[in-house]
Amino acid sequence: MKTYLVGGSVRDEILGLPVTDHDYVVVGVSPEEMVHLGFRPVGKDFPVFLHPQSQEQYALARTERKVSRGYKGFEVYASPEVTLQEDLARRDLTINAIAKDEYGNIIDPFGGIADLEAGVLRHIGPAFTEDPVRVLRTARFAARFGFHIAPETLALMNEMVHNGEVDALVSERVWQEIARGLMERHPSRMFYALRDCGALTRIMPEVDALFGVPQPPQHHPEIDTGVHVMMVIDYAASRNYSLQVRFAALTHDLGKGTTPPEEWPRHIGHEARSVRLVQGLCERINPPNEMRNLALLVARYHGDVHRAAELRPVTIANLLQGVDAYRKPERFEEFLQACACDFHGRPGYATRPYPQADRLREAFQAARSVDAGAIAKEMARNVSDPSRLPVAINTRVSETRIAEIRNRLGSLA
């Protein structure tokens, strides 16, 4: 029985990155022997065990054989006869097929260290094409490490797209990889990689459609809407914003991809079109509701936020009500963050001030200082017709909030 540290933990250690999870492969032992040694079996699709003390995962060396389409279409074979090299050969990229034994010796049969040093993402062999998730994973690693994809690997990814393998991915896996990619340091690199191999138009055609669509150069020096959106998500990443903010940043301008070319570079009404496209995208890839809800709000209202200095107090009050700021103040802050990312995601705008967000924060603080409960009690004493009471309360609360917003913003002028 021999135990090896494998995969991402070895890779990250070589790169000098923090190692949080340890994955082990065990060679020369049966499942029964693992149980006898005190390991607890937890694997559903292949033999994986938890160490009796550390609770870390130990997997028996295995091989895999493609038997049907999709990422689950594999037949797994695990036995004491499977070698370490055979186990490493089933992995996706050379940088993920490095092992270390208990004495610290490195086993690198596929040149992963050389590719780490060169900053290259390279597939191990033709079996790479058997798992469509590898298209997304490879693109995500490009975002994580800033590595470039080897031309021959990119060609295989393109082949997988054209063969329809990517179309077999279930929504849960697509969202899982997109979410992880958005949380990398440079998420745009994932989407550029997906576009390079043709996968973006299959997975997120709404985003792919943004590339090549011009915007007014006086507002968008980058001109290309797709490039703008990539700058927006990278800015969100540079600020360490949440996944909700990053997803909203990715989807806020989807409607510009449907603007008729004869109307370019203007995009009148793109906010409403963006809302419909965000709804369709979310129905397809099924992100959590908090992602969907924030993305819809940003798509609908980001133009209003950019014009905050021009908005009347009543319009600001309606905006606060529309984004449900009073009941969800934390989400309102994320809403403003996403709108700020849209502003900063342009050449030369990263360090410019964005007073619109602060203006709306001030307006919100003024509006939320209104005691709606006290107003309700007062109105209950003064309104004789109970059927008119709800409308009367809402009207008085709204009028008071508008007055507070007017006073607060007037004092800032």
Curated annotation (Swiss-Prot):
Q: Which cofactor does it need?
A: Mg(2+); Ni(2+)
InterPro entries hit by this protein = CCA_bact, HD/PDEase_dom, HD_domain, NT_sf, PolA_pol_head_dom, PolyA_RNA-bd, tRNA_CCA-adding_enzyme
Which EC numbers characterise this protein's activity in its record? 2.7.7.72, 3.1.3.-, 3.1.4.-
Residue positions binding ATP: 8, 11, 91, 137, 140
Ranges where the HD domain occurs:
225-326
Per UniProt, CTP binds at 8, 11, 91, 137, 140
Cofactor: how and how many bound: Magnesium is required for nucleotidyltransferase activity. Nickel for phosphatase activity.
An example GO BP is: RNA repair
One short Pfam name that applies is: PolyA_pol
Q: Where does Mg(2+) bind?
A: 21, 23
Note the Gene3D superfamilies from the entry: Beta Polymerase, domain 2, cca-adding enzyme, domain 2
Q: Which cystines does this chain contain?
A: none
Catalytic activity line of the entry: a tRNA precursor + 2 CTP + ATP = a tRNA with a 3' CCA end + 3 diphosphate; a tRNA with a 3' CCA end + 2 CTP + ATP = a tRNA with a 3' CCACCA end + 3 diphosphate
MF GO annotations: ATP binding; CCA tRNA nucleotidyltransferase activity; cyclic-nucleotide phosphodiesterase activity; magnesium ion binding; phosphatase activity; tRNA binding
Q: Which family does it belong to?
A: Belongs to the tRNA nucleotidyltransferase/poly(A) polymerase family. Bacterial CCA-adding enzyme type 1 subfamily.
Subunit and interaction comment? Monomer. Can also form homodimers and oligomers.
Query: What else does the entry mention about this protein?
Result: A single active site specifically recognizes both ATP and CTP and is responsible for their addition.
HAMAP family linked to this entry:
CCA_bact_type1, CCA_bact_type2
Described by its record, this protein's role is as follows:
Catalyzes the addition and repair of the essential 3'-terminal CCA sequence in tRNAs without using a nucleic acid template. Adds these three nucleotides in the order of C, C, and A to the tRNA nucleotide-73, using CTP and ATP as substrates and producing inorganic pyrophosphate. tRNA 3'-terminal CCA addition is required both for tRNA processing and repair. Also involved in tRNA surveillance by mediating tandem CCA addition to generate a CCACCA at the 3' terminus of unstable tRNAs. While stable tRNAs receive only 3'-terminal CCA, unstable tRNAs are marked with CCACCA and rapidly degraded.
User: Domain remarks in the entry?
Assistant: Comprises two domains: an N-terminal domain containing the nucleotidyltransferase activity and a C-terminal HD domain associated with both phosphodiesterase and phosphatase activities.
Q: What is this protein called?
A: Multifunctional CCA protein
Q: What is the lineage of its organism?
A: Bacteria, Pseudomonadati, Pseudomonadota, Betaproteobacteria, Nitrosomonadales
